[in-house]
Amino acid sequence: RDAFCELLGIKQDECAFISMPSPFPIENRPIFISPIGSMSMKNIDSSLPKLAQAVKAILAEHKNEKGIIHCHSYKVANYLKRNIRSSRLLAHDASNRDKVLFDHINGKKPTVLLSPSMTEGVDLKGDASRFQIICKVPYPYLGDKLIRKRMNKWKWWYPLQTIKTII
């Protein structure tokens, strides 16, 4: 609430906030954190084999369910597709993203999307995504001057943007 008002320049006593409970019971939305290695540009090549092994294990636990793997880059998506070698994995590029998404949502098989670009504007409701894997925490790009300026002005802004991308 404080962050919202400060970003928009609104006084808190001039607006109302409505808090709604989640429609999903907490036991239906567990979060498991399993760090496997640094996914920074410097270390990603040494972490990718460990990531592939971790993803294989998660896929085995969810063998009859559809899901999505948020890859953060085409490099990671392509690596996982090549090294896991499962017909369940659906990867896309910029030209066929919508078709692959359509096939995943409407198909009967328990496919899993490999995507660096399905964090906004995509509704994987119902059985279209029973699990998600986030390969790298989606921090905003620090090379962007506006992002850096906001981060320096408001210490809470950078982690807030990161968590908003995840949820």
Feature names for model-found ranges:
Residues 50-57, 79, 99-103, 117:
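Well-ordered alpha-helical segments embedded in enzymatic catalytic cores
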Residues 33-72:
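Conserved interdomain hinge at the start of the Helicase C-terminal
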Residues 3, 76-80, 123:
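Phosphate- and divalent-cation-binding pockets in alpha/beta enzyme and binding domains
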Residues 1-30, 94-97, 109-116:
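A contiguous, basic/glycine-rich beta-loop/short-helix subdomain that forms a polymer-engagement track
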Residues 23, 35-46, 94-167:
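Conserved RecA-like P-loop NTPase helicase motor core
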Residues 67-98:
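Conserved helicase motor "Helicase C" RecA-like lobe of SF1/SF2 P-loop NTPases
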Residues 2-12, 83-87, 128-132, 146-151:
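Short secondary-structure boundary/capping segments
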Residues 14-17, 31, 66-68, 87-88, ...:
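Beta-sheet entry/capping signal
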